[in-house]
């Protein structure tokens, strides 16, 4: 089946959808933004909640958890200010470095806001295999505040994610972007085994089915629109994480590198509709309530 012309496939639709991975930013702000880079013709523009709603709303997606990509501490406040004025933004995953002397104070500061639901550590900015004492201390601080931890890039890989998840078992962790599977037609060596080990040994770890179309090499916006192309990755994640630990995230607007939002949503809707109504509801919103503590 194809979603090339929009959402297709089974008529089964989720009753609610929480998109747990969007990015909002405004390069025209005083001081600009450290991400995305000016060289990115696709991404370097003002991207705000109404822009997301214009593409997500027609698919029935009306709530999101925003992931802050900027490493600047005050940019966490900027996105929280957005969320304070917009009920569609039900949660924020911040960007705070455990190697920063002010990490614990900043966690305490932002955690006072009920929409602040966690922190993301992205490989290259925060490498969890370096400065292990700071990383472990930071992870425990997050757990103590009832927050979760998103991991992206090299951090999502074994053995680092596994060690952290087992050392701090009361910390909810969400692996971003399929754990960096690579092209579904030729996944990265060791990805399938790594995913299996992490899923089986760490019940506190969730997998975000996000950045699906961006894993495909090739021209911008030209990712395959046939569900069959992505099945090697999707079926493996389903086998290992099951219906209780898979979460929906679009990674918009970065997802436009692979395909429009309607295609991104349509692919996973078709896949999870095929797993039954209960599994689909868990994937699109119920699991997000548990992982992120949103309402």
Label for each model-derived stretch:
Residues 28-33, 105-106, 186-188, 219-221, ...:
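Short aromatic-enriched loop/helix-cap "lid" or pocket-rim segments at secondary-structure transitions
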Residues 128-247:
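Catalytic pocket-lining loop regions of alpha/beta-barrel enzymes
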Residues 251:
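Active-site glycine-centered loops adjacent to acidic/histidine catalytic or metal-binding residues
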Residues 71-72, 98-101, 125-129, 181-184, ...:
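Short, small-residue-enriched loops and turns at beta-alpha junctions
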Residues 56, 83-84, 111, 165-166, ...:
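N-terminal cationic-hydrophobic initiation segments that often serve targeting/anchoring roles
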Residues 59, 86-87, 114, 146, ...:
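A structural signal for short coil/turn segments at secondary-structure junctions
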Residues 1-20, 45-63, 235-236, 240-247, ...:
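Mid-to-C-terminal alpha-helical segments outside catalytic/metal-binding sites
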Residues 11-145, 151, 228, 267:
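Mid-domain alpha/beta scaffold segments of enzyme catalytic cores
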């Amino acid at each position: 089946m194809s979603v090339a012309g929009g959402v297709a496939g089974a008529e089964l639709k989720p009753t609610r959808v929480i998109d747990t991975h969007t990015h909002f930013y405004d390069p025209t702000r005083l001081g600009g933004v450290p991400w995305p880079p000016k060289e990115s013709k696709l991404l370097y523009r003002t991207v705000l909640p109404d822009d997301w709603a214009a593409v997500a709303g027609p698919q029935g997606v009306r709530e999101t958890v925003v992931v802050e990509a900027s490493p600047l501490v005050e940019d966490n406040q900027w996105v929280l200010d957005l969320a304070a004025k917009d009920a569609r933004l039900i949660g924020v995953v911040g960007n705070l470095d455990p190697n920063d002397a002010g990490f614990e104070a900043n966690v305490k500061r932002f955690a006072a806001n009920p929409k602040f639901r966690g922190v993301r550590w992205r490989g290259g900015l925060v490498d969890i295999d370096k400065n292990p004492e700071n990383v472990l201390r930071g992870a425990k601080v997050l757990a103590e505040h009832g927050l979760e931890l998103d991991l992206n890039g090299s951090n999502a890989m074994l053995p680092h994610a596994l060690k952290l998840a087992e050392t701090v078992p009361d910390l909810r962790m969400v692996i971003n972007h399929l754990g960096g599977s690579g092209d579904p037609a030729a996944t990265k060596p060791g990805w399938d085994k790594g995913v299996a080990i992490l899923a089986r040994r760490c019940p506190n770890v969730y997998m975000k089915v996000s950045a699906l179309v961006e894993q495909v090499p090739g021209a911008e916006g030209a990712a395959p629109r046939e569900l069959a192309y992505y099945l090697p990755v999707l079926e493996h994640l389903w086998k290992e994480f099951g219906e209780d630990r898979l979460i929906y995230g679009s990674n918009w607007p970065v997802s436009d590198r692979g395909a429009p939002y309607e295609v991104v949503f349509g692919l996973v809707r078709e896949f999870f509709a095929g797993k039954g109504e209960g599994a689909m509801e868990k994937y699109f919103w119920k699991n997000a309530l548990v992982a992120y503590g949103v309402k």
